[in-house]
Amino acid sequence: MAKITRALISLSDKTGIVEFARELAGYGVEILSTGGTAKLLRDAGLTVKDVSEHTGFPEMLDGRVKTLHPKVHGGLLGMRSNPEHVATMKEHGILPIDMVVVNLYPFEATVANPACTLEDAIENIDIGGPTMLRSAAKNNADVTVVVDPADYRTVLDEMKASGGSVAKETNFRLAVKVYQHTAAYDGAISNWLGARTGEGVATYSDTITLQFKKAQEMRYGENPHQSAAFYVERQVQEASVSTARQLQGKELSYNNIGDTDAALECVKQFSEGPACVIVKHANPCGVAIGKNLLEAYDRAYATDPESAFGGIIAFNGELDAETAKAICDRQFVEVIIAPSVSKAAVEVVAAKKNVRLLECGIWPAQPAQRLDFKRVNGGLLVQDTDLALSAELKVVSKRQPTAQEMIDLQFAWRVAKFVKSNAIVYGKDGMTIGVGAGQMSRVNSARIAAIKAEHAGLEVQGAVMASDAFFPFRDGIDNAAAVGITAVIQPGGSMRDAEVIAAADEHGMAMVFTGMRHFRH
């Protein structure tokens, strides 16, 4: 391990750099720097040599050219163990640079701003930074390269232990981190620019680069024989399972995360009052609105108490102690997630130490559109996320729905969007009465919804029915009418719409078309 004698520091994120540079200076390391970083370090009382002085060449083109010079890259790429490299460096007056501390212009943060222009984005594409990082990382046998402030302490501790050197194993690990960082950076640029054409913004680029960071190594995947890990998007900001803070409980499993995502995204649909969603195997088994969270939970649980066992529970408001106690006293639960959790509720749930309690923060009323991905063998299906709900509802039956039926229809319709297809949801008074999920025939989903309601002791008479897609035959309507359903909401669009509408009229049911399908596979 050679002693570090010279370090080049140039940063956008200057977190912790003054303290880091001060300790480097304590080992006699000469510090080279540029622009704002150099000023910050000088203002802190450190001796800094400008890169332009080191190279004998001025910064130019509004700072676009600062470090793109042989005296920088020769000092980084020259192999200290190669006599020819050493001789060439000496011949041209190139001094070795043993450490690079660089992070990049904030391109992703810049383009995350809805007001970002193409010019703004272009000016935040870093050129010199990635070039230095790659040069230093390539020659990691001789150069320490630091791209993450979280590594400052590790580097300093090694220098302290060795008298000013960094182990080659550490240099290699840091170099790998650099290539991961620059790949993500270039991927973000490629994705953003690739979706822009001369005519504006295209939805899909010709190529896409997905960049996720590992957040958790898991014991196993969907099943115990499968290995797994959880990766999160680098710039995700909206309240989600990916950004949630775990307050207590065991580590989240692969299935926990998938089910919690389903529950949270479903409960986000409801803003008219306190709401609760209970999910099992990614399907809502109970959804309800109440005067408060406790009532919402009680009603959601009542839909299907058996399926709620071992489920995931999501709320759209702060979890209070009374609701937390009702859950813990009544059922086994894997995960509870809410925008916030009261201190008293945390204390209540603490008695059940294995319950995973998550706090996700408040979400916007209108979530930003995002892309949805599904892996297939050898490919990737990409679509925009199904966030929309039909703005225009069309009554196609002779009978108009009552005001309460219309409220219940829209409630059930929102739930159906989160039930695996074929999806049927029975609802009444802001509560699911029965849920039929994942059947190959729609009429069987309707039958299951009725069976669920009967099994839970819930009255179907006067309830409404929502279907995620059209009814291909009238049998689903006949079946619903037989158990007491009085109104139906569905997309419409079947070749047999006329027969289906006629069936509704025969039974005196109201029927509403949305014109929008919500398959979920």
Curated annotation (Swiss-Prot):
GO terms classed as biological process: 'de novo' IMP biosynthetic process
Gene expressing this chain: purH
Keywords per UniProt: Hydrolase, Multifunctional enzyme, Purine biosynthesis, Transferase
Domain free text: The IMP cyclohydrolase activity resides in the N-terminal region.
Pathway(s) it belongs to: Purine metabolism; IMP biosynthesis via de novo pathway; 5-formamido-1-(5-phospho-D-ribosyl)imidazole-4-carboxamide from 5-amino-1-(5-phospho-D-ribosyl)imidazole-4-carboxamide (10-formyl THF route): step 1/1; Purine metabolism; IMP biosynthesis via de novo pathway; IMP from 5-formamido-1-(5-phospho-D-ribosyl)imidazole-4-carboxamide: step 1/1
Protein name according to UniProt: Bifunctional purine biosynthesis protein PurH
Catalytically driven reaction(s): (6R)-10-formyltetrahydrofolate + 5-amino-1-(5-phospho-beta-D-ribosyl)imidazole-4-carboxamide = 5-formamido-1-(5-phospho-D-ribosyl)imidazole-4-carboxamide + (6S)-5,6,7,8-tetrahydrofolate; IMP + H2O = 5-formamido-1-(5-phospho-D-ribosyl)imidazole-4-carboxamide
GO cellular component: cytosol
Family annotation (Gene3D superfamilies): 3.40.140.20, Methylglyoxal synthase-like domain
Matching SUPFAM superfamilies: Cytidine deaminase-like, Methylglyoxal synthase-like
Limits of the MGS-like domain: 1-147
Annotated family: Belongs to the PurH family.
InterPro entries assigned to the protein according to its UniProt record, in alphabetical order: AICAR_Tfase_dup_dom_sf (IPR024051), Cytidine_deaminase-like (IPR016193), MGS-like_dom (IPR011607), MGS-like_dom_sf (IPR036914), PurH-like (IPR002695)
HAMAP family tied to this protein: PurH
Record organism: Geobacter metallireducens (strain ATCC 53774 / DSM 7210 / GS-15)
Record Pfam families: AICARFT_IMPCHas, MGS
